[in-house]
Amino acid sequence: MISRVDDLGVVVLLLAALVHALPLLGVLGGDQLQKLYAVQTDEPTLLLLLRHRAVLFAVLAAVFVYCAMSPSLRSVGLSMVLVCTASFVLLAQLGGDAMNPALKRVFWVDVILVSLSASVLLIQVGARVLGAKA
């Protein structure tokens, strides 16, 4: 059971890495960002911020891969996935009707990642409390 939880943690981290690497295409410019998020990027300031966001997400993706390959960092990586994705889910909920269909897709992907990362972390904590190594 323990190795399965550990394996699941690796899968969740790699899935999160893939999801966070996809926006890197946004660095290429407004057309790619339009395809990803269905937002107008005519304003240069917004375009700069979104392109920078794409780079930051790629850095996160690399960190998630590193954590997946480092057993001692998996819980840290899963916690990062949880914080990153839960923050978007919370902000999206507070934003009300501000989501277009593309952002709703991002929202639901993040809901799944929140559920998966929280589940693995809870199982790991439970195993530690019960005296097993997760």
Task: Give residue ranges: language-model regions.
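Interfacial segments of alpha-helical transmembrane regions
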Residues: 2-17, 66-81
